[in-house]
């Protein structure tokens, strides 16, 4: 299913022209229009899901191999020092277009791009409590 008002549905399905770097039956990968770095790409499923929570398992199983292909192409093309493969869910996590997508961002030492966080220092008891809560939710 696609959504009529979703820009990423339209880009993934060729309704609007864009810079396509990869396409198969399920996905289109395009250059980000507002890149964090040269070569920053978005992997877009052709079928609409707002986020990871709604993504069909069969689509989820196929997206990481595509991300791997894109990351390898970035490494080969740009000889970058690393590649971020990132996926955001909901506005609080940085999602700005509500169509599931994965970012691939070529990275270089000292490129000034900050996607890192300050590591926390939870106690063993806090970790045990958090672990139990998540395990219970997975039951």
Please provide the spans of the model-predicted regions.
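HIT superfamily nucleotide-processing domains
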Residues: 1-139
